[in-house]
């Protein structure tokens, strides 16, 4: 340092000025480089954050989001459910009501007689004196064959010369046609068991020896759907009489394009509709704006905007799957605590109603849970995924704990997801619908069949009643 001072003292004034100007220029250049590096660092930080969020999205599966299980990568020993192990052994539990296929009045009895001679002393045995000591049954089906009824139109001529003709029954309109029971069976297999036309024609030929073309199957479906239209509308009426209704929608293929299959369902029935749209106009068209009960659903905007006078209940498993994602990917303590809180609220609701607590105590407990929820939602998130979820939950916080006020309202929308699952089964087997009418027809018939299941009715008998236009569901 002393050496530098001595050298500078030897320099002239002009030389010192040149050195200062040169250093100033170098400083300005370095500051410019620093500014460019800071901008580059800022850009790279944004890119890193975007890539981290993209990686997080790619790591989502059916356990940590609303994605279907079919989109999950193959993993060994992966738990796809939010349910915990119960600790019970598999199979029937002690005390459950037993069931048996044993028949009290068999169609045929075969006596398995012992030998006619004693194997010990050699004396003859009178088999008429034998007694039954044990029974075993074998269940079989009789040989299957088609049953053909021929209607012959008779004629007679009076002595005066007037010729009189008999009349065919009203339902016999063709020279050769399918009877109602056979039509019902075709509808049952195609809709309830999702058998495509080709496999259905093969099955009818193999089982019954009946050769049926695809057009005959389509005619049976169309006739049943047309005659079932009044009952189809009745299903929506009886659903809207219930205290709660669940709603959901999923994509399907119609004429090679993406359409949407909707469902509204309750304990009394299931209503399906097919539409090109996924917005609130579909709700107005099919569900209306006069529902008096509670609507259970995920957070899709069309459901959020649906008129439900008693309020909305958000599906907890949907929220919990997103919380599981935050726990798994971001190690988020807030998500863990909120997930635990939601599980506790579900148990608390059952407890305060099953243990006979007074209305005052129940109200106090519910208010405490609402206060705790508000405290959870005001905590600041540490990443964009958490902030997005918090923002949505804050907006819809009034519909997260609504179920606690009524023991009959579910905290989930699982029944709607089960109801809509058949659309995906249909898509995986058949790929979709070739026509709009085929899609609408399937929605009508599926509504009839799923409602019959919920009301404990025989599906085949229900389809026959729809064909004869005598079907009426309970509650409508």
Per-region residue spans from a language model:
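Catalytic center-proximal scaffold of phosphoryl-transfer enzymes
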Residues: 3, 49, 154-157, 162-476
